[in-house]
């Protein structure tokens, strides 16, 4: 994101052009900024290489999730809907953590059958 000639740009596209192309308000994400932020974040953990999981509850946009997956991060989900979504986006089961309270037997069975990495049991 930057300014050129007193106009605000995201990845070389002016916000003015976007507002003429899309109904406002809208969300605008920078793929290059997201990739860079993930790279910088991961750099701090090079020695330990933990599985860093993105909270799908915070933003379940499929295109955003694909970028996150393509950068090697995992997914932290709290519902069967989120679990199904990240599987559809292409997250590997061994990079999915199922958190949250109030899991149904159906949700737990589904998660176990998909062989996800971890189910957090909370009160």
Regions found by a protein language model. Name each.
Residues 1-118:
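A charged N-terminal "starter" segment
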């Amino acid at each position: 994101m930057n300014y050129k000639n007193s106009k605000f740009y995201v990845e070389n596209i002016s916000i003015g052009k976007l507002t003429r192309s899309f109904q406002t308000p809208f969300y605008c994400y920078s793929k290059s900024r997201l990739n860079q932020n993930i790279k910088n974040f991961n750099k701090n953990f090079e020695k330990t290489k933990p599985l860093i999981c993105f909270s799908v509850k915070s933003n379940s946009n499929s295109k955003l999730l694909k970028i996150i997956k393509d950068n090697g991060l995992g997914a932290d989900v709290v519902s069967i809907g989120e679990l199904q979504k990240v599987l559809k986006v292409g997250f590997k089961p061994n990079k999915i953590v199922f958190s949250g309270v109030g899991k149904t037997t159906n949700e737990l069975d589904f998660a176990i059958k998909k062989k996800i990495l971890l189910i957090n049991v909370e009160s």
